[in-house]
Amino acid sequence: MGSYLPSTSGEREQMLADLGFDSTDDLYAIVPEAARAGELDLPSGLTELELREKLGAMAAENTVFRSVFRGAGAYRRFVPALVKTVISKEEFVTAYTPYQAEVSQGVLQSIFEYQSMVCELTGMDVSNASLYDGATAAAEAVFMCQDRKRSGVVVSATVNPQTIETVKTYCESRGVEVEVIPAKGGATDAPAFAAALGEATACAIIQQPNYFGILEDAGDLIEAIHAAGAKAIMAADPVSLGILASPGELGVDICVAEGQSLGLPLSFGGPYLGIIACTSALMRKLPGRIVGQTQDAQGNRAFVLTLQAREQHIRREKASSNVCSNEALCALAAGTYLACMGPDGLARAASSSYAKAHYLAERLCEIDGFDLAWDAPFMNEFATTCPLDPAALERALAERGVLMGLPIEFVPDAASGGSGTSEAAAQGRPHGSPERGILWCATEMNSKAQIDEAVELVKEWAR
């Protein structure tokens, strides 16, 4: 154990002697007895074998699902072994962009490569070094769009409910009005959405694919946003961008995304990764760190933190954001994942997810009472009706090692006479979802055998 201790017993005795004390108790005698912690009731140490057994017993108490059919913003995807190998290197194991950053050229280059790949994936001009998660990235994007004349925010109800609540939380303290437009048929109600845009609207947020997996008519929505003089923010699924049109191609001003799908495990909800990228016109409003490429005094390529005048350590309370410490290690994982997969690998993952989700939907619709909630194109998530209690089905499948889709509740479409401000909506439940429905998901991790097994279990329960 000597190598794990800062000093030996002999060194401690020498230090006490130099200070004129005979023991450690004499050293702390000046501390009142009532303020001392006393003896700590800690168990005795364990051998490595005993520790392995104890941790193994604790881990065995976890519920581990053989197959997962739940997404709703967090996805079980394949992670190449190289990702964990790279982020486990001691040179990288920190969440910080280092102080005296230019000394750490390797860290800066890894962030620069991440930024470059994010820009290539999203079709945007500039990316930062990452944010905390997709929801906070959306909130930061809203603040990028604020000015003296425009501050209002319009959000489609088909955006992830957690993102909507995060945006509302960020905006509340600044007195920024957030208007959520109810869905129609599981997608954005385009006429209502366009009607909500006005001279005071700073930005509008849409999601592609949306929370229910449906592919929005994004081009028309973005055109309506720009026609009103507002900025368009798109929350994108990064893996789906392997086959879908990029936000840049669609004319988006700011793209945000949850980067968990890019090489990060589900891991009890975090840490995840906030991706944000924008057009060059908004570059100086980007929050957080940005790494740039330049030349040193000898003419060699070098990497630096650039445009730092935006940041809180320079501008203090006038900074565009208070983000400082970031998700650098998670960004490294995402960058490594993208480098491993390449454009072709990402496209295969997206195509496989699409095909398996549609196969799952086809099989589920064979069961009486299970129907697609909406007749609309979807990516790798979809909602179905459920004839009985979804919570009971969830428990039944969990006992067999299968995590089914997320139970969701019905909020009537605005067009059908329902209120967009019902109690269910106020509780953060998604608008326009089917009564007693289930939001299913499939990725490249779901085999045909797993899908068939899950469908048979649902059939067995539904009899």
List each language-model region with its residue ranges.
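Conserved PLP-enzyme active-site core in the AAT-like
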Residues: 136-300, 369, 384, 391-395, ...
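Gly-rich Lys/Arg/Thr-decorated short loops/hinges at beta-loop-alpha junctions or inter-strand turns
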Residues: 89-101, 117-123, 149-150, 171-179, ...
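Short loop-beta-helix segment that forms the pyridoxal 5′-phosphate
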Residues: 99-103, 119-139
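Terminal amphipathic helices with adjacent charged low-complexity linkers/tails
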Residues: 146-150, 173-183, 373-410, 434-438, ...
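PLP-dependent enzyme catalytic core of the Aspartate aminotransferase-like
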Residues: 2, 11, 17, 116, ...
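Active-site C-terminal subdomain of aminotransferase-like
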Residues: 262-368, 372-375
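Compact, charge-rich alpha-helical regulatory domains located at protein termini
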Residues: 1-39
